Amino acid sequence: MKAIVYTTNAGSTEQYAKLLAQKTGLPVYSLAEAKRTLSSGTEIVYLGWIMASTVKGYANAAKRYRICAVCAVGMGQTGTQVDVVRKKNAIPQQIPLFTLQGNFDVEKLHGVYRFMMQMMVKFAGKGLSEKTDRTPEEDDMLDMMLHGGNRVCIENLQAVLDWYKNC
């Protein structure tokens, strides 16, 4: 592996990319920087943010680089939604996929994504708040929707770091 490449919208993915770079010693680039710096076919770890189960930037990165692992950052708890994200993005089974819980602040989102998330919070939040048998994961999601949240932490990267040590 030669580098860490990421796409971010509100900053969580960039935070994870930089934490991972600190722990691995690999250089870190935004996808735009990587296109100017890295050769086509370079082995990378790709980090992207999740929107409707789609890992933003993954398709472009996969066309250009040899992706050794994918880290998808979203609102769900770390380690959840792996099967859905893998299927939606057609990530091959042999490529490790890690989901990481990021931060959530509607005000940090840009453009249409802010509007979409405001609507999601309004409707999904209402449905979750009315649900009487919420799981702990649903309680956490509701809390993030209603109050925002900072969930980026090195502990969420442990499975990624374990994989990296063994590859």
Regions found by a protein language model. Name each.
Residues M1-Y29:
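Short, charged N-terminal beta->alpha structural module
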Residues S30-A32, C153:
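Helix N-cap / beta->alpha transition motif
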Residues A32-V112:
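Helix-loop-strand module that forms the ligand-binding subsite of alpha/beta enzymes
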Residues G102-L128:
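Short, solvent-exposed beta-strand-terminating loops
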Residues M119-C167:
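Glycine-rich phosphate/pyrophosphate-binding loop and the adjoining helix
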